[in-house]
């Protein structure tokens, strides 16, 4: 399953992004997924909850859910 998610800022940390994308319900769940190595950013396992995501980044969770980060420019 692939979808896009638009964070409200120019960048967003991985932990709150997973909550925004409704992959997890809490920061604790996000922490577990990230630290257990179930999250990839642009094809690389990411274990830092604070990893900054930017426009075009692709987040893959548990080799099942793929989300592309889309940042819309301010007008």
What does each model-identified segment do?
Residues 2-4, 55-75:
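A positively charged, amphipathic N-terminal helix/segment that binds anionic biomolecules
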Residues 4-10:
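Short, contiguous acidic and Ser/Thr-rich linear segments
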Residues 10-12, 63:
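Exposed, low-complexity/repetitive linear segments and helix-based recognition motifs
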Residues 12-55:
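A basic, amphipathic helix-loop patch mediating RNA/tRNA/ribosome contacts
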């Amino acid at each position: 399953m692939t979808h896009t998610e638009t964070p409200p800022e120019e960048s967003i940390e991985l932990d709150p992004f997973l909550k925004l994308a409704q992959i997890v319900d809490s920061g604790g769940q996000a922490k577990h997924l990230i630290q257990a190595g179930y999250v990839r950013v642009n094809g690389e396992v990411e274990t830092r909850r604070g990893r900054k995501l930017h426009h075009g980044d692709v987040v893959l969770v548990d080799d099942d859910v793929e989300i592309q980060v889309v940042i819309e420019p301010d007008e």
